[in-house]
UniProtKB/Swiss-Prot annotation:
Molecular functions per Gene Ontology: ATP binding; ribonucleoside triphosphate phosphatase activity
Record-listed ATP binding positions: 9-16, 100-107
Protein name: Nucleoside-triphosphatase THEP1
Hydrolase found in the keyword field: yes
The EC number(s) this enzyme carries: 3.6.1.15
Species in which this protein is naturally found: Hyperthermus butylicus (strain DSM 5456 / JCM 9403 / PLM1-5)
CDD domains: RecA-like_Thep1
Gene3D superfamilies reported in the protein's UniProt record: P-loop containing nucleotide triphosphate hydrolases
Length: 187
Protein backbone atom coordinates (compact mmCIF):
# COMPACT_ATOMS: atom_id res chain seq x y z
CA UNK A 1 0.00 0.00 0.00
CA UNK A 2 1.13 3.54 -0.74
CA UNK A 3 1.86 5.83 2.16
CA UNK A 4 3.31 8.64 0.05
CA UNK A 5 1.63 10.64 -2.67
CA UNK A 6 4.15 12.34 -4.93
CA UNK A 7 3.40 15.18 -7.34
CA UNK A 8 5.90 16.17 -10.01
CA UNK A 9 5.98 18.01 -13.31
CA UNK A 10 7.63 20.84 -15.19
CA UNK A 11 8.08 24.24 -13.52
CA UNK A 12 5.01 26.45 -13.80
CA UNK A 13 2.60 23.63 -14.70
CA UNK A 14 0.48 23.92 -11.54
CA UNK A 15 2.05 21.62 -8.94
CA UNK A 16 1.78 24.14 -6.11
CA UNK A 17 -1.80 25.05 -7.02
CA UNK A 18 -2.70 21.35 -6.93
CA UNK A 19 -0.84 20.94 -3.61
CA UNK A 20 -2.83 23.74 -1.98
CA UNK A 21 -6.19 22.54 -3.31
CA UNK A 22 -5.56 19.14 -1.73
CA UNK A 23 -4.06 20.45 1.54
CA UNK A 24 -6.86 22.98 2.09
CA UNK A 25 -9.57 20.40 1.43
CA UNK A 26 -7.98 17.96 3.88
CA UNK A 27 -7.55 20.64 6.55
CA UNK A 28 -11.17 21.74 6.08
CA UNK A 29 -12.18 18.13 6.76
CA UNK A 30 -10.21 17.98 10.01
CA UNK A 31 -7.06 16.20 8.84
CA UNK A 32 -4.06 17.50 10.81
CA UNK A 33 -1.52 18.47 8.15
CA UNK A 34 1.99 19.58 9.11
CA UNK A 35 4.90 20.47 6.89
CA UNK A 36 6.23 23.37 4.86
CA UNK A 37 6.12 25.01 1.48
CA UNK A 38 8.69 27.14 -0.34
CA UNK A 39 7.09 30.03 -2.24
CA UNK A 40 9.02 32.29 -4.55
CA UNK A 41 9.35 35.94 -3.56
CA UNK A 42 9.29 38.71 -6.14
CA UNK A 43 10.74 42.19 -5.78
CA UNK A 44 9.09 45.52 -6.56
CA UNK A 45 9.96 45.26 -10.25
CA UNK A 46 8.33 41.85 -10.43
CA UNK A 47 11.44 39.72 -10.79
CA UNK A 48 12.18 36.81 -8.47
CA UNK A 49 14.52 37.70 -5.62
CA UNK A 50 14.41 34.43 -3.74
CA UNK A 51 12.42 31.76 -1.94
CA UNK A 52 11.06 31.43 1.57
CA UNK A 53 10.36 28.35 3.65
CA UNK A 54 7.04 28.64 5.48
CA UNK A 55 5.41 26.21 7.91
CA UNK A 56 1.95 25.17 6.74
CA UNK A 57 0.35 26.35 9.98
CA UNK A 58 1.93 29.79 9.54
CA UNK A 59 3.88 29.55 12.81
CA UNK A 60 7.27 30.21 11.24
CA UNK A 61 9.10 31.26 8.12
CA UNK A 62 12.58 32.18 6.95
CA UNK A 63 14.44 32.82 3.75
CA UNK A 64 15.38 29.59 1.99
CA UNK A 65 17.49 31.28 -0.69
CA UNK A 66 18.10 34.77 -2.02
CA UNK A 67 20.03 36.39 -4.81
CA UNK A 68 21.93 38.32 -2.15
CA UNK A 69 21.99 38.50 1.62
CA UNK A 70 22.53 34.81 2.40
CA UNK A 71 25.83 33.01 2.78
CA UNK A 72 24.96 29.34 2.26
CA UNK A 73 25.80 27.15 -0.73
CA UNK A 74 24.80 28.53 -4.12
CA UNK A 75 22.08 27.00 -6.31
CA UNK A 76 21.86 28.72 -9.68
CA UNK A 77 21.48 32.48 -9.08
CA UNK A 78 20.59 32.05 -5.42
CA UNK A 79 22.51 31.62 -2.19
CA UNK A 80 20.86 29.37 0.37
CA UNK A 81 20.11 30.72 3.84
CA UNK A 82 21.09 28.48 6.77
CA UNK A 83 18.25 29.84 8.95
CA UNK A 84 15.87 27.79 6.77
CA UNK A 85 17.21 24.68 8.50
CA UNK A 86 15.69 25.78 11.82
CA UNK A 87 12.24 26.26 10.29
CA UNK A 88 12.35 22.92 8.46
CA UNK A 89 13.43 21.05 11.59
CA UNK A 90 10.34 22.27 13.47
CA UNK A 91 8.31 19.83 11.37
CA UNK A 92 10.00 16.96 13.23
CA UNK A 93 8.51 18.15 16.51
CA UNK A 94 5.05 18.02 14.92
CA UNK A 95 5.23 14.45 13.60
CA UNK A 96 3.34 12.99 16.55
CA UNK A 97 0.47 15.45 16.10
CA UNK A 98 0.18 15.10 12.33
CA UNK A 99 -2.11 12.85 10.31
CA UNK A 100 -0.19 13.89 7.18
CA UNK A 101 3.12 15.55 6.37
CA UNK A 102 3.03 17.79 3.29
CA UNK A 103 6.06 19.41 1.65
CA UNK A 104 6.20 21.65 -1.43
CA UNK A 105 8.89 21.23 -2.72
CA UNK A 106 11.66 18.69 -2.49
CA UNK A 107 14.17 20.02 -4.99
CA UNK A 108 17.77 21.19 -5.42
CA UNK A 109 17.33 24.37 -3.35
CA UNK A 110 15.88 22.55 -0.35
CA UNK A 111 18.32 19.65 -0.54
CA UNK A 112 21.36 21.94 -0.77
CA UNK A 113 20.96 22.79 2.93
CA UNK A 114 22.06 19.81 5.03
CA UNK A 115 19.58 20.53 7.83
CA UNK A 116 16.61 20.73 5.45
CA UNK A 117 17.78 17.56 3.70
CA UNK A 118 18.09 15.73 7.06
CA UNK A 119 14.59 16.86 8.03
CA UNK A 120 13.18 15.49 4.77
CA UNK A 121 15.03 12.20 5.30
CA UNK A 122 13.66 11.88 8.84
CA UNK A 123 10.13 12.66 7.66
CA UNK A 124 10.42 9.92 5.03
CA UNK A 125 11.74 7.48 7.64
CA UNK A 126 8.97 8.34 10.13
CA UNK A 127 6.31 6.21 8.45
CA UNK A 128 3.84 9.11 8.43
CA UNK A 129 1.75 9.44 5.28
CA UNK A 130 3.01 12.23 3.08
CA UNK A 131 2.09 14.50 0.20
CA UNK A 132 5.27 15.65 -1.50
CA UNK A 133 5.85 17.92 -4.47
CA UNK A 134 9.18 16.89 -5.96
CA UNK A 135 11.37 18.51 -8.57
CA UNK A 136 10.91 16.86 -11.94
CA UNK A 137 14.57 15.81 -12.10
CA UNK A 138 14.96 14.77 -8.46
CA UNK A 139 18.02 12.53 -8.27
CA UNK A 140 18.67 12.10 -4.55
CA UNK A 141 19.07 8.30 -4.15
CA UNK A 142 18.01 8.27 -0.48
CA UNK A 143 14.73 10.04 -1.21
CA UNK A 144 13.99 8.09 -4.37
CA UNK A 145 14.63 4.78 -2.56
CA UNK A 146 11.84 5.69 -0.15
CA UNK A 147 9.38 7.35 -2.53
CA UNK A 148 9.53 4.94 -5.47
CA UNK A 149 8.42 1.72 -3.76
CA UNK A 150 5.93 3.23 -1.31
CA UNK A 151 4.60 6.16 -3.30
CA UNK A 152 1.94 6.75 -5.89
CA UNK A 153 3.21 9.29 -8.40
CA UNK A 154 1.24 11.92 -10.30
CA UNK A 155 2.88 13.79 -13.18
CA UNK A 156 1.15 17.14 -13.64
CA UNK A 157 0.77 18.47 -17.18
CA UNK A 158 -1.23 21.33 -18.64
CA UNK A 159 -3.63 18.73 -20.04
CA UNK A 160 -4.35 16.94 -16.74
CA UNK A 161 -3.87 19.61 -14.09
CA UNK A 162 -7.60 20.33 -13.77
CA UNK A 163 -8.56 16.71 -13.09
CA UNK A 164 -5.61 15.70 -10.91
CA UNK A 165 -6.50 17.53 -7.67
CA UNK A 166 -9.41 15.16 -6.98
CA UNK A 167 -7.31 12.08 -7.83
CA UNK A 168 -4.46 13.26 -5.61
CA UNK A 169 -6.92 14.10 -2.83
CA UNK A 170 -8.41 10.58 -2.97
CA UNK A 171 -4.95 8.99 -2.90
CA UNK A 172 -3.88 11.09 0.09
CA UNK A 173 -7.16 10.45 1.89
CA UNK A 174 -6.64 6.70 1.53
CA UNK A 175 -3.01 6.90 2.71
CA UNK A 176 -4.16 8.74 5.85
CA UNK A 177 -6.99 6.25 6.40
CA UNK A 178 -4.60 3.29 6.14
CA UNK A 179 -2.23 4.88 8.64
CA UNK A 180 -5.12 5.18 11.09
CA UNK A 181 -6.06 1.56 10.52
CA UNK A 182 -9.35 2.21 8.75
CA UNK A 183 -10.35 1.27 5.23
CA UNK A 184 -12.10 4.53 4.36
CA UNK A 185 -11.50 7.91 5.88
CA UNK A 186 -14.84 9.36 6.83
CA UNK A 187 -14.46 13.07 7.28
Amino acid sequence: MHSYVVVTGRPGVGKTTLFWKVVRKLMDEGVVVKGFYCPEVRGQQGYRIGFKIVLLDGSGEAWLARREGCNGPRVGRYYTCPEAETIASRVLGELGKADLIAIDEIGPMELRLAGVRRTIYRVLDSGKPGLFVVHERLSDPYILARLKPSGVWFHVTIENRDVLPEKVYEAVKQAVARSKGVGELSL
